[in-house]
Structure formats: C-alpha cells, structure tokens
Amino acid sequence: MGCEHAQAAGGQTSPSQFEENTLSEVKRVIAVLSGKGGVGKSFVTGAIATELARRGHKVGVLDADITGPSIPKMFGMSGRHVHALGNLMLPEISEHGVKVMSSNLLLQNETDPVLWRGPVIAGAIRQFWSETSWGPVDYLLVDMPPGTGDVALTVFQSLPVDGIVIVTSPQDLVSMIVAKAVNMAEKMNVPILGIVENMSYIECPDCGKKIEVFGKSKLPEVAERYNLDILGQLPINPALAEACDKGEVETALPDGMLPKAVSAVEAITPHETDEA
C-alpha cells in the first residue's frame, strides 16, 4: 500500500514499509488521538465508527490502546476471541458489521492485565495491521493510546495514517495538548481533521439548558489559534455511558451524532492499495 504521507519528517517511512497482506484492502486510516486518558477517546472512536457503518461504509477499528483496551466491550464482544486464517488473524465483527482487532480479544479473560513492555506493544500494533485479514475496509479507525509517545510514533510509522481526530475535554490543558498533537502531526506529515470536545456540558433534564460543569470551554480560542476545525462538542450522557459498558453502543447511539466529524472522515481521498 502506498500513501502520500510516506515522506514524513521525524521518522520517515517509505510506502513499502506499510506492510499489508493480500487479504486486506484498507482504503483510509484515521487515528483518534488524545493527550491523556479519561477524556472519552474510545467513545468518540466508537461513535464515529458506528455512524460511518450506518452510512453504509465498511468500517474497522484497530484498538492500539494495548494496555487499556475498551473497544471490544463497547461493541458487545466481551468473552470473544480472535480466530486464525492460516498465518493471519481474523478481526471480530460486531452485530452491525464493524470489524475490531484488540489485545482484549487475545486474552483468556478480558480482565487480565497486559504486562507488556514497549517493544512488545509496538510489535502487537504492527501485527494488528499487517497480520490481520481486514478484508475490504473503507475506513479503519485507530483508537490510539493516550499521549504522543513511543506507541503513537509506532502507529504513524507502521500504518499509512491519512488523518487525525483529536479528542479533548474542558478540564484538559487543551492548548498544550493540542500543541503537542499539532507538532506530532506536522513531523509525521499527517493532516489533523479537527477537534472533538467530549464532556462539554450536561443538559438540564427539565429545561434543556446546557450547564458547563467544568467551566467555560476554551476550545474556540484554541481551534482558532491552530487553524483547526471544531468537529463537535458532546455532552455528559450517563445513559450512553451505561450503554457502552453493556456493549450496546451501536443501538444506543443517537442517529446523526458527530456529523461534522463523520463528514470530515468521509472527505478523505482513499489512497491506492497495492497487493503485497
């Protein structure tokens, strides 16, 4: 597979290094990134994946948050395990057709800790890309580990990432986190599609007024400073959080959530796929 981002500075990768097996035809790869944990990055990944699938696209999620995976549980895959096809792994498929590969699908029990060092984690992410039979996929979303460290670098050097969605929350040090993400994106020559702010407010059940529990959002100022699009601001929604814990994100997610984010992902031009 070739990619226009292959001439990235600060960790240059040639197209030939994006190893893809002959049973995978992934057209676009989108990384969902946050500066720290606890901001709902995995939920945003799941929401975008669900909405893309509802629009008729073939969707996959590569869970690169190896030590803190939550994607399988969100998509109702607790207790399920990946199977093999020759030397390749087969992703698990959700009720509504979203393909998922995650470290939790390799463990005997989903509560077992993943006590792997950095190089092993990096190797697992590369295997999730090159040794998984993804089949035809229009959009592969990568649920990144928190931060912009070694594991994030592994993703950008091992996968032909076409765009980045940044997830923040109002209590984040938004400016610093966005600055780090922007710097990484520039060094890896990958465009940032925009920012999603999660937990922006809570809606009063009586009058519908938006209450900013964590204070006034700084997102508009930060987005303007770095010339980034705001892709959405999501409320705190306890019912939806409970549905994710029950593995019901695909049925519980309101129709039309994050329309700007989904449209930004859809607007990415597919890169050429070459048989390995």
Tell where the protein language model's regions lie, with residue ranges.
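Conserved Switch II/interswitch segment of TRAFAC-class P-loop GTPases
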Residues: 135-139, 148, 160-181
